[in-house]
Amino acid sequence: VHTEIQLVEQQLNRIILGKPQQIRLALTCLLAEGHLLLEDLPGMGKTTLAHALAESLGLSYRRVQFTSDLLPADLTGFSIFDARSQQFSFQPGPVFSQVLLADEINRASPKTQSALLEAMEEHQVSVDGETRPLPAPFFVIATQNPLFHSGTNALPESQLDRFLIRLSLGFPDRDAELQLLQQDSSASQHKIVPALLSTERLIALQQQIPRQQISDEVLGYVLDLIGHSRKRSDMLPLSPRAAKGLVRAAKAYAFLQQRSFVTADDIQAVFPAVAEHRLQPRQQQQYAGLAQQLLLETPCLV
């Protein structure tokens, strides 16, 4: 059952070197029908990961460079009047793709950010009073630079909450970077990545995720983690949406581990990626590791 998705994972690991856990979490996000936020410095492989993921799965792919003057219609599309037919014809925007890379989303205006996040939530867009469904699967990979970079508009908490998982690829280790330097960069950029999965098969795999078993004891551990965040005065608490997302991600992660049931280890593996961007500190100063703190402070009795 899992052979195809394992082959996809192996292929991605040959393209993105030295990042097996980040690749597994990206696939977890896709299988759980969530959306992915990649936060990293420029040049760390965010675009390469998005493109390789789309090609490996045989999905249509579009990339949009977000800038301060990007308009919502540049994403969703617009209607053009045809003088010959005396009718309006709709020109679909890049949001009508199966994998959309929203590059540097925090450089766009809040209005344009909202247009994308509405499409992510509703899986449809309204243009000129007509609602148009988006293709299935619909997977957004948004990238953003750290907030200390100039020209960035921070995503508000309500919009960050729409992303199931946030990842940072980080710097490669020495061996991976040596391999990277030994590669012919021009050849590797134009290398054809074979599609290993059909769209129909991917949708079928996504439909299997809710059937994964999770015991009441493991759900109790999830509630303990979520509840502990609500007792802390130094951070914004985790919402019920975050709790549901955590369970969904853990089910997909267990599926990738070739198991039909979720363990506490699966919860712990996905919790930082699911929770960290939602655990905003109440003070102005930014600090990381809040999700890890919750894991350490919450007893696991499962």
Task: Go through each PLM region and give its residues.
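Canonical AAA+ ATPase core
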Residues: 82-87, 108, 112, 120-197, ...
